[in-house]
Regions:
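Low-complexity, Gly/Ser/Thr/Pro-rich intrinsically disordered linker/tail segments
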Residues: 144-163
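Solvent-exposed, polar/charged alpha-helical surfaces in well-ordered, non-transmembrane soluble domains
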Residues: 5-12, 32-35, 80-87, 97, ...
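Substrate-binding/active-site groove segments that recognize
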Residues: 33, 49-70, 78-86, 107-108, ...
């Protein structure tokens, strides 16, 4: 079975998830977003491995795959895990850019920065997915603007007792 067909089948299984409406996505928008994310993550390579150890089409980290109960080396399970993880981020953040940032940098980073973390990798990742979405829908491909968090994370002061 072809990769694009598996992506379509996976997105179709999840097209009625409540998270989509909360993030302003319909079934078609969800399919395009999911396919664009998979393209950005792995260029449709089911055996892609990142320098950090993420694996497969959805570039699932080993711990994320375990928490989702999927085998990242199984193409269908990897896609299902990626879909469920992205849907969890959409449900939590109710915003496409924040959900993509959470998928890329981790949800704790989005919470820590109260927005898209100011990391070049995350900014470029979100912009790339928007460009792919535009291409897949026949929209003009332009450089989308990604709104980064405008503040540093709040951290309690560190007290060091030298005595």
């Amino acid at each position: 079975m072809g990769i694009l067909k598996l992506i379509r089948e996976t997105s179709a299984r999840h097209q009625h998830d409540d998270a989509l409406a909360r993030a302003g996505l319909n079934a078609k928008g969800w399919h395009i977003l999911f396919q664009a994310m998979i393209e950005a993550e792995s260029s449709y390579n089911p055996t892609a491995v990142s320098p950090k150890g993420a694996y497969g089409l959805g570039q699932l980290m080993p711990q994320t795959a375990r928490s989702l109960g999927v085998d990242p080396r199984d193409v269908a399970q990897n896609l299902d895990g990626a879909a469920r993880y992205l849907l969890a981020q959409l449900s939590t953040f109710q915003n496409i850019d924040l959900a993509l940032a959470a998928y890329n940098a981790g949800p704790h980073r989005v919470v820590e920065y109260s927005g898209v973390p100011p990391f070049a990798e995350t900014r470029d990742y979100i912009a790339r997915i928007h460009r792919i979405r535009n291409r897949l829908t026949g929209q003009p491909v332009s450089q989308p603007s990604v709104h980064l968090a405008n503040r540093r994370p709040e951290r309690p002061p560190v007290h060091i007792d030298l005595n």
